[in-house]
Amino acid sequence: MAETVADTRRLITKPQNLNDAYGPPSNFLEIDVSNPQTVGVGRGRFTTYEIRVKTNLPIFKLKESTVRRRYSDFEWLRSELERESKVVVPPLPGKAFLRHVPFRGDDGIFDDNFIEERKQGLEQFINKVAGHPLAQNERCLHMFLQDEIIDKSYTPSKIRHA
């Protein structure tokens, strides 16, 4: 029988300098969900969240952008991705049906603690989705992240690298 010998030589790498170690990564995509604002009155009341994007990925047309989105916009994005892409889309933070019950002891869906929990859940959702290479090619994701107004009558398509 032939004897196998493990090759234990180290890979040859170039020395790392401070810019390599602490400089910006070669490709990055940072998305923050912040600054919730409740607008409207009565049945027309809802909360919007600021979506801030910073990236150097060439597929995105803007390197920095800020838009405001409400929960129903996240639902739209999720349904578009499920319908049009091969991406397994993570769940959104749940709907708050019981928080709509009148005569609650708190503000229901407008309670500060609920809004903070939802904000964190939405940030986890959008970072998982936008971090997926196939999702990054979907026009609906680009509209959601970078267009001031979402054109819900758009034609679903893929984004081509610039």
Swiss-Prot record:
The modification N-acetylalanine is found at residue 2. Changing residue 160 to A: Abolishes phosphoinositide-binding of C-terminus. It is found in: Early endosome; Cytoplasmic vesicle, Phagosome. The lineage of its organism: Eukaryota, Metazoa, Chordata, Craniata, Vertebrata. Changing residue 158 to A: Abolishes phosphoinositide-binding of C-terminus. The modification Omega-N-methylarginine is found at residue 43. The PX domain mediates specific binding to phosphatidylinositol 3-phosphate (PtdIns(P3)). Highly expressed in developing red cells and hematopoietic tissues. GO terms for molecular function: phosphatidylinositol-3,5-bisphosphate binding; phosphatidylinositol-3-phosphate binding; phosphatidylinositol-4-phosphate binding; phosphatidylinositol-5-phosphate binding; retromer complex binding. Residues 27-151 form the PX domain. The modification Phosphoserine is found at residue 72. Pfam families: PX. Ubiquitinated, leading to its proteasomal degradation. Deubiquitinated by USP10. This is Sorting nexin-3. PANTHER family: RE52028P (PTHR45963), SORTING NEXIN-3 (PTHR45963:SF1). GO terms for biological process: heme biosynthetic process; hemoglobin biosynthetic process; negative regulation of phagocytosis; positive regulation of neuron projection development; protein to membrane docking; regulation of intracellular protein transport; regulation of protein metabolic process; regulation of Wnt signaling pathway. It comes from Mus musculus (Mouse). One of its GO terms (cellular component) is early endosome. Keywords: Acetylation, Cytoplasmic vesicle, Endosome, Isopeptide bond, Lipid-binding, Methylation, Phosphoprotein, Protein transport, Transport, Ubl conjugation. Belongs to the sorting nexin family. CDD domains: PX_SNX3. Phosphoinositide-binding protein required for multivesicular body formation. Specifically binds phosphatidylinositol 3-phosphate (PtdIns(P3)). Can also bind phosphatidylinositol 4-phosphate (PtdIns(P4)), phosphatidylinositol 5-phosphate (PtdIns(P5)) and phosphatidylinositol 3,5-biphosphate (PtdIns(3,5)P2). Plays a role in protein transport between cellular compartments. Together with RAB7A facilitates endosome membrane association of the retromer cargo-selective subcomplex (CSC). InterPro entries: PX_dom (IPR001683), PX_dom_sf (IPR036871), PX_SNX3_Vert (IPR042137), Sorting_Nexin (IPR051074). Changing residue 161 to A: Abolishes phosphoinositide-binding of C-terminus.
